[in-house]
Amino acid sequence: TVERNAPDWVAITTAPGQMKDVYLPDSTLVALAGDSWIRYDAKRYDKERRAVEMNGKAFFQVTRNEARPFSVKTSQTEVTVLGTSFQIDEKPTVTEVNVVTGKVCFTAGEEKENVILTAGMSAQYSMENKEITVVTEEDVNKLAWRTGQLRFMESPLDKVIEDLSDYYQVKIANQTKNEGARLTATFNNLPLEDVLQVVNQTLDARLVSTSKK
């Protein structure tokens, strides 16, 4: 009987720098970022519920099915939805959820603290503080690895550096005197050198990429 109930795991893995689109049995789309994995039990998936486990970063576009909620588990958190699109990014100390459409329930920690997030909202769970922080302002750059677009609206230099470092996977040094500078610009699939040139010229700044992260 143990054998019969044993999970039949289907696992999909990506190498660093690789991206992969995966369709689950219910047509839910999972876009895996580099150095990530996802798995589900083929025997049980879409029977009573739709449960997935993951590590790393992934974007989900969930096929709506009110009878069978969809849930994603990371090491410390869980997201449950009916039908929506959202991203989970699990880093060593923080797990972040960004909701693009629909509504999700984000549960975290041993206390099973939970928050409801709607389109445009995001939340972070800190492993250190054991707390969920909710952000109501939408940050489109969190999805730049999927869209190829980086958008800045009156963004301070620190935010620009953080987003560029994350997107291009490099370290960027700020050798700028102009600390209070803010950037308004949109970049579509541009190489880092071009972006840095625009930022430096526009803001009279000096940002230099130093190395791979």
Question: Which positions does each model-derived feature cover?
Answer:
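A residue-level detector for the "anchor" residue at the start of short, highly conserved motifs
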Residues: T1-K213
